[in-house]
């Protein structure tokens, strides 16, 4: 309806570029077009929570680190916090596409490069990127031959898998929502997408 039959045919696949995400990974950019919020909607607005709690970019990464620690991974090394890029620098141009780096496995030099925006999409992306980082950290002690993911697809799947853990229960555990809000959100399957 929004774009018309000439752009998006009524019968057929939705062109991936219409999602507003170059990799077709998320529908969040067209959420307002495909979901009409009803008066009894119970979806959780993570962006608003981040704003209301005045959570900064580093704190967003700390939430993700705490998640990985809670499932048995070791803390990130101090060098991660010293050498990663979390906020877009004002003094130079950088490519802001989020990425994870394993620069020196012998010294556990792990970093992310990301111009974090204080919103839900980046909160999820941080968890994805730290999925890569913790995966790197898990195999850095192995012989050089084995210091790599099983394949690139598996590395991406690992990062994406962990983002699926950002559920109402998780948001309750990190004190973003109350138990009642989490339970109400779980009743709205569209809101969980």
Task: Walk through the language-model features, giving the residues of each.
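Cation-handling catalytic/transport regions enriched in His/Asp/Glu
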Residues: 1-193
């Amino acid at each position: 309806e929004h774009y018309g039959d000439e752009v998006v045919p009524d019968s057929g696949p939705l062109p991936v570029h219409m999602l507003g995400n170059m990799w077709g990974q998320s529908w969040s950019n067209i959420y307002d077009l495909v979901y009409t919020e009803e008066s009894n909607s119970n979806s959780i607005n993570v962006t608003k929570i981040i704003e209301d709690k005045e959570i900064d970019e580093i704190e967003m990464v700390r939430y993700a680190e705490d998640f990985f620690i809670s499932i048995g991974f070791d803390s990130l090394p101090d060098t991660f916090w010293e050498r990663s890029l979390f906020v877009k620098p004002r003094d130079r141009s950088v490519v802001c596409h989020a990425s994870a780096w394993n620069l020196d496995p012998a010294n556990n030099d792990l970093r992310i490069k990301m111009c974090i925006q204080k919103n839900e999409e980046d909160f999820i992306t941080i968890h994805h990127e730290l999925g890569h980082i913790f995966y790197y950290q898990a195999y850095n002690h192995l012989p050089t031959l084995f210091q790599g993911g099983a394949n690139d697809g598996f590395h991406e799947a690992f990062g994406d898998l962990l983002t699926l853990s950002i559920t109402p229960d998780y948001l309750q555990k990190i004190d973003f929502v109350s138990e009642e809000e989490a339970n109400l959100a779980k009743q709205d399957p569209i809101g969980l997408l």
